[in-house]
Regions:
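Contiguous, well-ordered alpha-helical segments that form the cores/surfaces of helical PPI scaffolds
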Residues: 67, 310-323, 344
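Conserved catalytic cores of very large enzyme subunits
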Residues: 1-306, 327-328, 332-492, 497-499, ...
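Short, intrinsically disordered terminal segments enriched in charged and Pro/Gly residues
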Residues: 502-509, 513-515
Length: 516
């Protein structure tokens, strides 16, 4: 297993979608000119990210940046029509800040996600458009923050919808910079929840249902998560039972997962209770601005954190099934059904734990990040397999990155998996190059994904940037200035990153990828 953010064990929670409107400090900006109010609000937002980012261990999100900040500025009597240049400059500065500020834990940038797309009025539409446009126009090495576009029928999904133009603008930006990614509000698992309540982190964390009545992500957290190494369980099962047929090996592997999951549950509960026992003074920003769905000043931490999720994650479903059955789930119906069976089995367990402990246990399709290579390095010291040669395990339930199956088929194969992973998941389409100028083509894939059951969708492609002249494309030597000083931007686990800073497992995965 891998205990994520171990250095924060029992000290703080993982991630949070801000309840930004509940206690917004309007009085701090009362009486200011429009220009000062605009600059002041965006400076406040940066300060908020910086402060909260050091009170917790993971990402931060705004569920409805466009609507919420249109409401904030309207309350402050700020008119966007006469201040467009100031808004553009302030949003541009915010984007640059997200890339250049490295004060999280004293050394790294912040994991920030803006969810947009549901804009209800012209002001909100302007903010959504400007965020996308300024990100699009920013330098090729600007790859933060993560922007998530919420796709919903009657709002932006179809040509007759009021915000369809914003969807096309978002897809145009994705074709150049891989951002935004897309939260598909009409998919099977999300269609019964109001789109305004839905929000995701760039790392794929999903917080929706709540045993205590606070449906949706706003003001709620993932408290902690632990990932189980599925290939390791398969290797151990085959070693323990070398003569069993594959169907029986599969059942034995599930039994082994169950025993590990019981231990994981104990650790999650221990961490949750220790976090709830912390002094609320360790969370001064949450106290001051009441960003959680409950008021910790009144109820204490446990009554607020109980609305959060405790997630059991998994990695390497594909490799696990390969070890057991000797094949790939995307081209074998029997193995594909076993994949569905395994996901249903794991989800059934987390649902039972939620009932047993009256807490929001969930199943998380883990992003690889630190563990895709780490697990391989550990396992290959104990077992022998050709699977280790590639140097990493495949993220969550994904089709392996060198499968070369068509994009529509990858989407449809993975789509059925999403509904089981109520703690978060994402499907990616791997493209050979940036689909610049083809938003309609990406829109068709978005539509296929919605109908296939995909909850969260991203588009990946290799993006190389010349560090000398800024030319972008796919190359080892710049075609403009002949420089070999190339910066490679890739997405492997959720957020875009520079490939030079990848862990070994992520570097191996990036090199192995083939286009769908």
């Amino acid at each position: 297993i891998h205990i994520h953010d171990l250095d924060a064990y029992g000290l703080t929670y993982n991630c949070l979608t801000f309840d930004i409107l509940k206690a917004f400090p309007y009085s701090d900006f009362a009486g200011l000119s429009s220009v000062k109010a605009i600059l002041g609000v965006f400076d406040f937002l940066k300060e908020l990210f910086e402060r909260v980012g050091n009170e917790q261990s993971g990402g931060m999100a705004l569920a409805n940046f466009d609507n919420d900040f249109a409401s904030i500025f309207t309350t402050l009597n700020v008119d966007y029509k006469n201040n467009k240049e100031i808004f553009c400059a302030a949003i541009r500065d915010l984007i640059i800040w997200c890339n250049n500020t490295h004060t999280r834990m004293g050394q790294t940038s912040y994991y920030i996600s803006f969810n947009i797309g549901l804009a209800e009025n012209d002001f909100a539409r302007f903010l959504a458009f400007t965020l996308i446009d300024e990100f699009y126009k920013a330098g090729e090495l600007i790859y933060k923050p993560n922007i998530i576009f919420k796709v919903a029928k009657g709002i932006n999904r179809n040509p007759q919808d009021r915000n369809y133009d914003l969807l096309l603008k978002a897809l145009e930006c994705t074709g150049k910079k891989m951002i935004p990614t897309y939260l598909l509000c009409d998919c099977e698992m999300d269609k019964d929840t109001s789109p305004e309540l839905l929000s995701v982190m760039g790392c794929r964390t999903r917080v929706v249902t709540d045993r205590f009545g606070k449906s949706g992500a706003i003001g709620r957290s993932n408290i902690d998560n632990i990932t189980i190494n599925l290939p390791r369980l398969a290797f151990e099962t085959v070693k323990d039972h070398p003569d069993l047929p594959s169907d029986e090996l599969f059942e034995k592997c599930k039994e082994k997962w169950l025993s590990i999951a019981d231990t994981v549950t104990e650790i999650l509960l221990d961490r949750f209770h220790k976090t709830c026992m912390q002094d609320i003074d360790l969370f001064p920003t949450l106290k001051q601005y009441d960003l959680l769905c409950g008021n910790i000043n009144i109820t204490g931490l446990s009554e607020v954190f109980k609305h959060g999720t405790l997630s059991i994650g998994f990695i390497g479903l594909s490799e696990m099934l390969d070890v057991i059955f000797g094949g790939k789930f995307w081209d074998n119906e029997k193995i594909y059904n076993a994949a569905l069976n395994m996901l249903s089995f794991m989800r059934g367990y987390t649902d039972k734990q939620a009932e047993k402990y009256n807490l929001n246990f969930s199943l998380l399709a883990t992003s690889g990040e630190l563990i895709s290579g780490r697990f391989v390095e550990i396992d290959q010291t104990k077992f022998k397999s050709d699977i280790f040669k590639k140097g990493f395990y495949t993220n969550s339930f994904h089709v392996e990155v060198d499968s070369k199956i068509p994009a529509w088929e990858k989407i449809e194969k993975e789509g059925k998996f999403h509904a089981y992973c109520n703690g978060g998941c994402i499907s990616y389409v791997e493209l050979a190059e940036a689909p610049i100028g083809n938003p309609q083509g990406l829109d068709e894939l978005v539509e296929i994904a919605i109908n296939a059951g995909v909850h969260y969708l991203g588009f990946n492609y290799p993006k190389d940037v010349c560090a000398e002249c800024g030319t972008s494309g796919t190359f080892d030597v710049c075609p403009v200035c002949n420089s070999s000083h190339i910066t490679r931007i890739r997405r492997v686990s959720g957020y875009l990153e520079i490939q030079d800073y990848f862990t070994s497992g992520k570097k191996h995965e990036a090199k192995t990828r083939k286009a769908n």
